Curated annotation (Swiss-Prot):
Enzyme class label: isomerase
One biological process term in Gene Ontology: D-xylose metabolic process
High-level lineage: Bacteria, Pseudomonadati, Pseudomonadota, Gammaproteobacteria, Pseudomonadales
Protein name: Xylose isomerase
Annotated organism of origin: Pseudomonas syringae pv. syringae (strain B728a)
Domain of life: Bacteria
Length: 438
């Protein structure tokens, strides 16, 4: 029995369509810069917000009445949830999905039950993937929801909790490998602290470093060819999280010699919480050589928490996509919709409305970003702005041919008196707007 009987496969109808169940801009096989849209964007729907979240919040119980979320045998419900998920993915026309281990299988009362349940559901997911052609963008382990992880997983003061988390990550990595996932994500949901009064920062950082090295070792042992991705977030649920932002993650990776092994999965809403723009986080990761993938959503700038709304700003997503295209596009990553409908969006059809609109936003942003790249006025301006560093003097400074003292002598001898030059910010903002609102 279908879970979404009133929805046909969502199709491209063009900009003049007024149907909320049709794409106006996302034409999956349309070529952009010589590559189909679907291959540029590599869009994924997430399991947790779409099929697990019951519509609960801090002040109230769940508002949704999803048929796959009723009472009954947990394994039967998990099987039904998988059937609903792949019906949704197929009708939406999205190519990828993502999950946590405990999204797809009941956790059970012991590790033995966990292993049995998860293995059983991986069998089901594999069959659904083969039948539908839908692929796994990434898998991960939920090492934050169970009360045992209240003080963290890898950073926990109890080594047995560390071992329990390692077991889940071991299992989820193996499942991701079997399901031919493109990436494996490590989100440190509670890897942080509530108060420094009971926290040993150095010890917890060393534990995290040891854990990540074990993950890297296991990746190579099982022959996983995808990327390992840390997902930065500054706070929530903890007061302070150790993977605060892209720059912080890079510093951590360098400390433990992992900067060539692990990249970042950047979430728009997490950038907001860190006081950064989404554009900033992507540009920073690209500049550091650790850009991997994207969690596509948005936060509310007036709220200090993770609202995980669907992306709806073509302007924001154009700048993000421009930065990604300039870096060569996704390798293994993609745009994963870590987004959820609002608590008052009660109907199953709302799941389609949110995803369809967001997919159109990304498609339009891709076209605008491609146009910016083809006539790259921003890069032309940057080349001119930094041109002095390409001249012999600038090159010799960068090459280490001057000491601080000899550089000062050079300035005195040549009576240097450089003048400020306009940064042309307003001009460049106008240039961007002309591409976006063409």
């Amino acid at each position: 029995m279908p879970y979404f009987p009133d929805v046909d496969r969502v199709r491209y109808e063009g900009p003049d369509s007024d149907s909320p169940l049709a794409f106006r801009h996302y034409d999956a096989d349309k070529l952009v810069l010589g590559k189909p849209m679907r291959e540029h964007l590599r869009m994924a729907a997430c399991y947790w917000h779409t099929f697990v979240w019951p519509g609960a919040d801090m002040f109230g119980v769940g508002t949704f009445k999803r048929p796959w979320q009723g009472s009954g045998d947990p394994m039967e419900l998990a099987i039904g949830k998988a059937e609903a998920a792949f019906e949704f993915f197929s009708k939406l026309g999205i190519d990828y999905y993502s999950f946590h281990d405990t999204d797809v299988a009941p956790e059970g009362a012991s590790l033995k039950e966990y292993r049995h349940n998860f293995a059983h559901m991986v069998d089901h997911l594999e069959r659904h993937q083969q039948q539908s052609g839908i692929k796994l963008l990434w898998g991960t382990a939920n090492c934050f929801s169970n009360p045992r992880f209240a003080a963290g997983a890898a950073s926990n003061p109890d080594p047995e909790v560390f071992a329990y988390a390692a077991t889940q990550v071991f299992s989820a990595m193996n499942a991701t490998q079997r399901l031919k996932g493109s990436n494996y994500v490590l989100w440190g949901g509670r890897e942080g602290y509530e108060t420094l009064l009971n926290t040993d920062l150095k010890r917890e950082r060393e534990q995290l470093g040891r854990f990540m090295r074990m993950v890297v070792e296991h990746k190579h042992k099982i022959g996983f060819k995808g990327d390992l991705l840390i997902e930065p977030k500054p706070q929530e649920p903890t007061k302070h999280q150790y993977d605060y932002d892209s720059a912080t993650v890079f510093g951590f990776l360098q400390q433990y010699g992992l900067e060539n092994e692990i990249k970042v999965n950047i979430e728009a809403n997490h950038a907001t919480l860190a006081g950064h723009s989404f554009h900033h986080e992507i540009a920073t990761a690209v500049s550091l050589g650790i850009f991997g993938s994207i969690d596509a959503n948005r936060g509310d700038p007036q709220n200090g928490w993770d609202t995980d709304q669907f992306p709806n700003s073509v302007e924001e997503m154009t700048l993000a996509t421009y930065e990604i295209l300039k870096a060569g596009g996704f390798t293994n990553g993609g745009f994963n919709f870590d987004s959820k409908v609002r608590r008052q969006s009660l109907d199953d059809i709302d799941l389609f409305h949110g995803h369809v609109a967001a997919m159109d936003v990304l498609a339009l942003a891709l076209e605008r970003a491609a146009a910016m790249l083809q006539n790259d006025k921003l890069q032309h301006f940057k080349d001119q702005r930094y041109a002095g560093w390409q001249q012999p003097f600038g090159q010799s400074v960068l090459a280490g041919e001057f000491s601080l003292a000899s550089l000062a002598e050079h300035a005195f001898a040549n009576e240097l008196n450089p003048q400020a030059v306009s940064g042309r910010q307003e001009l460049l903002e106008g240039v961007v707007n002309r591409f976006i609102y063409a």
